[in-house]
A protein has these predicted regions:
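Short, basic/aromatic recognition patches
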Residues: 1-13
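Short solvent-exposed loop/turn micro-motifs enriched in small/polar/acidic residues
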Residues: 15-17, 92
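Small-residue (primarily alanine) positions within well-ordered alpha-helices
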Residues: 4, 22-23, 52
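Zn2+-dependent cytidine deaminase-like catalytic core
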Residues: 33-122
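Short beta-strand scaffold segments in enzyme catalytic cores
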Residues: 17-26
Length: 123
């Protein structure tokens, strides 16, 4: 969670002032961070989770299995991934999501936050 917290400090959110940080732990033990990056054309903004996942996918094509993602925002507790991010994380086999609910860390199996999901094995 400390990596996600640190990533939230790098967010670019001049319009909403809603800072989010994410940290991904891969099966290979690597950690990748991301923060939300807003754009004046709001639809072009990218969430912290997708930012971290694209960094992971680019950094090491052999280590693209997500063991867990931690998500943090100083603006909201808990801060869960949005629907688009959940589907994006699903692509890389995310197993667990960790959020800080203000009183401590909460862990959720990925299937609990995206039940009956569609993934690569469905094609």
């Amino acid at each position: 969670m400390e990596s996600a917290r640190g990533a939230s400090e790098r967010a670019y959110a001049p319009y909403s002032n809603f800072h989010v940080g994410a940290a991904i732990l891969t099966g290979g033990g690597n950690v990748y961070q991301g923060s939300n990056i807003e754009n004046a054309s709001y639809g072009l903004s990218i969430c912290a989770e997708r930012n971290a996942a694209t960094t992971m996918a680019f950094a090491d094509p052999e280590d693209r299995n997500i063991e867990l993602v931690a998500v943090y925002s100083p603006n909201a507790a808990p801060c869960f991934p949005c629907g688009a991010c959940r589907q994006f994380l699903r692509e890389f086999g995310c197993k667990e999501v960790i959020v800080d609910d203000g009183s401590g860390l909460r862990r959720y199996p990925f299937e609990q936050i995206l039940p009956n999901s569609f993934g690569p094995e469905d094609l």
